[in-house]
């Protein structure tokens, strides 16, 4: 008998957990919103209940009457950690809206060697990205194109971006170690910051690029010839003296 009662109580508990989890539905279930843009969602109950929204912006108290739905909306999303939650009287059932707030970087720039480069020698470039969010959606890439233009761009390198737990804007420097060849003289190098926000995010994914860095590459043979000419000139000068 005790076993039967235990099974009944267990079944009832599972039923209650299921109904509590399913008693509220938020649509859309997930939002991707640009910082400063409006946002809205609808909370629906399976049965008429007193509903409310708890949020740092756009929150409401419980409705006076039992209703089957209640809307949440804000004119401008300005809280990076906003967690709008729909709930029923007594908090017996609640559901949180999954919302991602994003922001394009304030600036994307690239630094590199200040003077001409020599083919085959390794140089360091850096992509500087200022205040972009969320950091865990950031993808950084370095590209190269011929002197003609960017139509034939080639991906040089995509550095690993450390995964971020914060939802607030981040800034970072992302390095590239690269050795140019003789054919890279006159080519352009630049980097980009792309936010991969998934299917619900803007399509194509928003991307901000740096200004191009024009490459000046000297060949080893050219340098050797130049050095030889200087040496000959110095020898002749010494002979004349």
Where do the PLM segments sit?
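Proline-enriched interdomain boundary motifs that mark the N-terminal boundary
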Residues: 20-27, 104-113
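N-terminal Sec-dependent signal peptide, specifically the hydrophobic helical h-region
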Residues: 1-31, 35-37, 41-59, 80-99, ...
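Solvent-exposed serine/threonine-rich low-complexity stretches and specific carbohydrate-binding patches
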Residues: 57-72, 152-167
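Solvent-exposed loop/turn motifs of extracellular immunoglobulin-like beta-sandwich domains
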Residues: 2-6, 33-38, 65-68, 75-87, ...
């Amino acid at each position: 008998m005790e076993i039967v009662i235990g099974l009944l109580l267990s079944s009832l508990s599972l039923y209650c957990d299921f109904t509590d989890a399913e008693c509220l539905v938020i649509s859309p279930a997930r939002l991707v919103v640009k910082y400063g843009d409006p946002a809205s969602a609808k909370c629906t109950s399976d049965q008429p209940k007193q509903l409310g929204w708890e949020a740092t912006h756009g929150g409401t108290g419980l409705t006076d009457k039992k209703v089957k739905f209640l809307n949440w909306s804000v004119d401008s999303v300005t809280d990076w950690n906003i967690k709008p939650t729909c709930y029923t009287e007594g908090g017996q059932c609640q559901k949180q809206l999954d919302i991602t707030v994003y922001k394009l970087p304030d600036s994307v720039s690239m630094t590199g060697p200040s003077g001409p480069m020599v083919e085959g020698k390794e140089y360091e470039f850096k992509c500087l990205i200022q205040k972009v969010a969320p950091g865990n959606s950031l993808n950084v890439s370095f590209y190269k194109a011929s002197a003609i233009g960017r139509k034939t761009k080639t991906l040089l390198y995509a550095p690993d971006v450390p995964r971020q737990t914060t939802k607030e804007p981040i800034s970072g420097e992302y390095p590239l170690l690269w050795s140019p060849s003789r054919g890279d003289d006159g080519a352009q190098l630049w980097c980009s910051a792309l936010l991969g926000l998934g299917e619900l995010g803007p399509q194509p994914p928003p991307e901000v690029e740096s200004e191009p860095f024009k490459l000046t590459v000297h060949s080893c043979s050219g340098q050797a010839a130049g050095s030889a000419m200087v040496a000959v000139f110095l020898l002749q000068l010494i002979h004349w003296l």
